[in-house]
Design a protein with these regions (language model features):
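N-terminal Rossmann-like FAD-binding beta1-loop-alpha1 element of flavoenzymes
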Residues: 3-31, 360
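Short, solvent-exposed loop/turn segments at secondary-structure junctions
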Residues: 12-13, 36-38, 101, 156, ...
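Glycine-rich FAD pyrophosphate-binding loop
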Residues: 22-48
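Mid-domain catalytic core of redox enzymes
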Residues: 24, 216-328
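Dinucleotide-binding Rossmann-like beta1-alpha1 core, especially the glycine-rich loop
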Residues: 49-123
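Structural/interface elements that position substrates and couple domains in central-metabolism enzymes
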Residues: 70-71, 137, 146, 265, ...
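Active-site/ligand-binding neighborhood in enzyme catalytic cores
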Residues: 90-229, 233, 238-240
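C-terminal catalytic lobe of FAD-dependent flavoproteins
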Residues: 312-365
């Protein structure tokens, strides 16, 4: 059989592309996925205790894009959910992102207005110009003490690099607040798929024009498969057989525990910002899904360089390697590289969906 498109990867990028091409343009699609499941890192499943958990760590859907929200709403109902995170610093819990409550509790202040907190930040900040790295972007806003307490050690554990070795985009993802808003995100649309991400992907890919091949490296079938075009969402360095060197990624090793408790944590996730703990984060999944159960399942996250590719490591050295691969990819006709791994970019889920929706529209004109 001949396919219109061979799509490598069944995560957000590959699945949205497949659905749009099949349903809107009547294209015949073969998706090839190296794992034994669809949904990429958003994959969720019920553990042995009946708790719906995210196999690759917490994935919280949030977006300001009405187009993205309405598109995904075709495949799922939603549960309203606003994510909250507490930082564990020396056994005490503080809201993250840093806000007025964090500052008041940490420094025994009693600020009641945004201006007071803004003035406080102004009094402790150390001007950095130009902003060259992740240390600069935080110290420039809130000074050394808050940087060292909440950002330095956590970032070093997460990336095994000092913040001054990482692009400003890493720590720049986290806002600094002057109000008491303790939600992790402030996007207009904040929900969780009612029946989980995997069910949403199953509905998305349930189309007679879409065929899925799991447990398969695309390189093992590409010479025997007839297709007109390819959409590649895997690691770009692997596509080119690492000819310019391997692009580094951070991965995560998870340790799982199930405990006899209806609720364990005061927020869905705790970030451990000190040096004492090797893990960076604990997450209690029931708080996201709204499940009612006599037990609760939590994951502990230990960043590592071994395992599945989770996070591209954004710094100048890696960017130079990626640009060589990107230049090479642009020479290829009928192959589209899209997604976090193939663009070596730290996209959120909604950003990937939005990018693919625009890309498929553009390429089908």
């Amino acid at each position: 059989m001949k396919y219109d498109y061979l799509i490598v990867g069944a995560g957000f990028a590959g699945s949205v592309a497949a659905e749009r091409l099949a349903s809107q343009h009547n294209k015949k699609i073969l998706i090839v996925e190296k794992r034994n499941h669809i949904a990429g890192n958003a994959y969720d499943e019920f553990d042995e205790f009946g708790i719906l958990v995210h196999k690759y760590g917490p994935h919280i859907f949030h977006t300001n894009s009405r187009e993205v929200f309405e598109y995904l709403s075709k495949f799922t109902e939603w549960r309203k959910y606003e994510h909250k995170v507490l930082a564990n610093l020396d056994g005490k819990l503080y809201p993250i992102p840093i806000n007025r409550t964090t500052v008041n509790k940490l420094y025994n202040k009693s600020f009641t207005s945004d201006k007071e907190v803004s003035d406080f930040y102004e009094s402790v900040r150390e001007k950095r110009n130009p902003i060259l790295n992740s240390e600069d972007i935080i110290v420039n806003q809130v000074g050394t003490d808050l940087y060292e307490k909440f950002f330095k050690n956590y970032t070093k554990k997460q990336w095994e690099l000092d913040p001054n070795q990482l692009s400003p985009s890493v720590c720049g993802r986290i806002p600094i607040r002057t109000n008491t808003d303790d939600r992790y995100f402030t996007d207009k649309y904040q929900f969780m798929p009612k029946d989980g991400y995997t069910k949403m992907f199953e509905k998305m890919l349930n189309h007679p024009n879409i065929e899925i091949m799991l447990n398969t490296d695309y390189k093992s079938i590409i010479n025997d498969t007839k297709f007109d075009k390819m959409i590649y969402t895997g690691p770009i360095d692997y596509f080119f057989d690492y000819k310019f060197g391997k692009l580094p990624y951070r991965s995560i090793r998870f340790e799982w525990k199930n405990l006899k408790a209806t609720k364990l944590l005061k927020a869905t996730s705790y970030n451990f910002v000190g040096q004492k703990e090797q893990y960076t984060r604990i997450t209690e999944y029931k708080q996201m899904t709204g499940q009612i159960s006599k037990t609760t399942s939590v994951s502990y996250e230990f960043p590592t360089f071994v395992g599945e590719e989770f996070y591209p490591i954004p710094n100048d050295e890696n960017d130079l390697i990626y640009k060589k691969y990107k230049k090479e990819s642009e020479k290829l006709k009928n192959i589209l590289f899209v997604g976090r791994l193939s663009e070596y970019k730290y996209y959120n889920m909604d950003q990937v969906v939005g990018r693919v929706l625009q890309t498929t529209k553009k390429n089908m004109k």
